[in-house]
Amino acid sequence: LLGYGADPTPDLTAELDRIQRDRVRRARQMVDLIEAETGVSLDLSVGPGIGRPHIARAVAESSAPYDYAGAFGRLIGGEGPCYVPREITDAETGIALLRESCGLVSLAHPFRYRDPEAALEICAELDAVERYYAYDHPMDPAPVEHAIERYDLLPTGGSDAHDQRLGVAGLDSADWERVASRLPGAER
């Protein structure tokens, strides 16, 4: 889930803190597993904000026999020996927390879920869906377009930094204006 125009409540702050602690715990476990699996010491500082892309880059820059894609595919992807699952906030809790503190709540990258169609059903309770996202494989946008029409959603754009550059997938100015007009303090 994505929350836009946030004015964090204490409950949201507490949940974000828990997520960040889990993110660091998970990264530390994956780094430990990779180092044990490969016999290579990774040059990586594990702290807030770390994710698998950072770990994959560190693997690619090490003497381990994996490039960035190989680190995901062979080590830290969902089936990899060094993968550690996240403790994910359930959708109901996440939606409630974001509704209390955000002007706009959006479903993030719907094609990254095991069942994209089921994920898009959550949009019935949301304001928007991430229509533009830099997926690593071609996707048919029709299911997202259908959800946008069916639930009268705003399209949002991806901002994840999974590549070496930002701004790969985003909104055009007209779509951005529609999103911005729904945010707190918008004077349009």
Task: List each model region and its residues.
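Extended substrate/RNA-proximal surfaces in nucleic-acid metabolism proteins
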Residues: 1-119
